[in-house]
From Swiss-Prot:
NCBIfam families: trpB. GO terms for cellular component: cytoplasm. Its cofactor is pyridoxal 5'-phosphate. InterPro entries: Trp_synth_b_CS, Trp_synth_beta, Trp_synth_beta/beta-like, TrpB-like_PALP, TrpB-like_PALP_sf. One of its GO terms (molecular function) is tryptophan synthase activity. The modification N6-(pyridoxal phosphate)lysine is found at residue 99. It comes from Brucella anthropi (strain ATCC 49188 / DSM 6882 / CCUG 24695 / JCM 21032 / LMG 3331 / NBRC 15819 / NCTC 12168 / Alc 37). This is Tryptophan synthase beta chain.
């Protein structure tokens, strides 16, 4: 495919129709269109309102614990013997991941719109926990749709959601993973448009979700940019993040998109390899199609049916990706690469033993890419890896895979 001519800025999208080039848009049921337009109007008003910004900033600081630290991973750096590796510590946020950034922004939007019920989808459970958390904080009922497979492999997070007062509904359709949970959440939303706010957790879905999720998550990259300038006196050579739907990645990437000297790498779930269908590397092995209200790269068969996919990481187990990532791939600004389950598991253990930090399996995919790249770089070069979440939720999964009885 011919790459489009590089734009003057990579940060101007989406357009008024929610398109990033040929990706994005609003492919939704007629009953949802008025709600989507209402949400867009509410968001446009909110983001220009100093009071909204002040309230979000206060919650981010005093409730979520921002700014998150930019930490020099000295043990891992020395072990690999190449570039200096920094971790953006989103795992230290309240609820244990980057998900709280977006949830705080959206719960304030829901309040402005007068919505009285929150629904959400979740894969690894981190977005479900963050949604249940903000719903509890603002006294709203919350229903979380979660694939039955993910309910089984993320039991600690299921309990946390219930403890926070959310109703967790297992979805057994399909493979019982994130795609199926999102399908059910959309069905709920269509049925309950008057009082319900759908708090989407990733940078996908119909416009304006990819834009607003990106904007709420861009605090990651804005902080990291300022922090690396303070600590190293210059911008990084490389930034790396795991990509499922893509919210933590776009949050880190977006503020760096127009810095031509910064190489940007998104890491997809290579699962058990790209030869078969047991992976979730939609940009490495998929093609454009429409799912969950937007046009993007998808895993699909010759008839256009969506494939189920596989990843050891519940949060990367999604057969699509946010539309802005699809555009960034085709424009050539960001490189997207797959990491296998086994490589992520190795990186999970290596990070734990060299840094005393247990990363989420999603983040371990990004660390695995750092393990590959850092030794090929000079010791004077700098890399930032987004540590998007902590690994408490994954210890049972990892223990089982390593043959340990937990």
């Amino acid at each position: 495919m011919n790459k489009p001519v590089a734009p003057n800025s990579y940060k101007t999208g989406p357009d008024e129709e929610g398109m990033f080039g040929i990706f994005g848009g609003r492919f939704v049921a007629e009953t949802l269109m008025p709600l989507i337009l209402e949400l867009q109007e509410a968001y446009e008003t909110a983001k220009n309102d100093p009071e909204f910004k002040a309230e979000l900033n206060a919650l981010s600081t005093y409730y979520a614990g921002r700014p998150s630290k930019l930490y020099y991973a000295e043990g891992l750096t020395k072990h690999l013997g190449g570039a200096k590796i920094y971790f953006k510590r989103e795992d230290l946020n309240h609820t244990g991941s980057h998900k709280i950034n977006n949830c705080l922004g959206q719960i304030l939007l829901a309040k402005r719109m007068g919505k009285t019920r929150i629904i959400a989808e979740t894969g690894a459970g981190q977005h479900g926990v963050a949604s249940a958390t903000v719903a509890a904080r603002f006294g709203l009922p919350c229903v979380v749709y979660m694939g039955a497979t993910d309910v089984e492999r993320q039991k600690p997070n299921v309990f946390r959601m219930k403890l926070l007062g959310a109703e967790v509904i297992p979805v057994s359709a399909g493979n019982g993973t994130l795609k199926d949970a999102m399908n059910e959440a959309l069905r709920d939303w269509v049925t309950n448009v008057e009082d319900t706010y759908y708090l989407i957790g990733t940078a996908a879905g119909p416009h304006p979700y990819p834009e607003l999720v990106r904007d709420f998550q861009s605090v990651i990259g804005n902080e990291a940019r300022q922090q690396i300038l303070e600590q190293e006196g210059r911008l990084p050579d490389v930034i790396v993040a795991a990509v499922g739907g893509g919210s933590n990645a776009i949050g880190l990437f977006h503020p760096f998109l127009d810095d031509a000297s910064v190489k940007i790498v998104g890491v997809e779930a290579g699962g058990r390899g790209l030869d078969g269908e047991e992976h979730c590397a939609s940009m490495s092995a998929g093609r454009p199609g429409v799912l969950h209200g937007n046009r993007t790269y998808l895993l699909q068969n010759d008839d256009g049916q969506i494939l189920e996919g596989h990843s050891v990481s519940a949060g990367l187990d999604y057969p699509g990706v946010g539309p802005e990532h699809s555009w960034l791939k085709d424009s050539g600004r960001v490189d997207y690469v797959p990491i296998l389950d086994d490589e992520a598991l190795d990186a999970f253990q290596l990070c734990t033993r060299t840094e005393g930090i247990i990363p989420a399996l999603e983040s371990a995919h990004a660390i695995a890419q750092a393990v590959k790249m850092a030794p090929t770089m000079g010791k004077d070069q700098v890399m930032i890896v987004n540590l998007s979440g902590r690994g408490d939720k994954d210890v049972h999964t990892v223990g089982k895979l390593l043959g340990m009885d937990i």
